[in-house]
Amino acid sequence: MLVTQTNGNIEQKMKKTYNLEDSAEDFVWKTIDPDDIWVMDKLILSRKMKYNCGPVGQDVPVPGWYIVRPCVNMLGLGLGAEKLWIEEETYNLTIGNFWCEWFEGKHLSVDYYKGKQMLCVEGHKPEHTLTKWKEWRRNDIHVPFPEILNNLIQRYTWMNCEFIGGKLIEVHFRRNEDFDGNINHFIPVWEGESTTPPKGYTYREYPDLHGRIGAFVK
């Protein structure tokens, strides 16, 4: 069953059948220690990181640009996230979401194994979207393991952390499998686009919930 997002709401369509039940994310949610679920809650994580953030209903301290998204989103992929200018009140926003100061800078996805960095990739996308990425590239940027996660290393050997401008914004108890096989460049292909790969690239099917059907990889 394909889950898609339309006008801010999640709806299910029997359009295509994707295997969502056996994902690494499913396994994590079925087996995670309840005491560690705070890591999956982006509001709690952001508060622990001392960011300017709060739940919908709480006023922002200063007018500005904020990222507003669900506190918990197992499906990932930026579902429900939006960039908003907020003057003060947030009562009119979606219940269950939270707001956080807007960060600028490189968007990095980093895999750690027992606290040691194993992979770092940088994502690029147009400014007008939070979901449709243009590309992801492997690089050699070193990002220190977040100290806030030190006491979890023994229980979760693999962790994937996302950073914007050096700020930790998201944590997953799994690794990034898109770059398996020494892949260095991952270019998403969206519905309606050609699946004929550029010279030197291979096309692979990588369907997701935003209309991505695959990717050119090299």
Regions found by a protein language model. Name each.
Residues 1-47, 195-214:
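ATP-binding N-terminal substructure of ATP-dependent carboxylate-amine bond-forming enzymes
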Residues 19-148, 189-193:
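Active-site nucleotide/adenylate-binding loops and adjacent lid/helix of ATP-dependent enzymes
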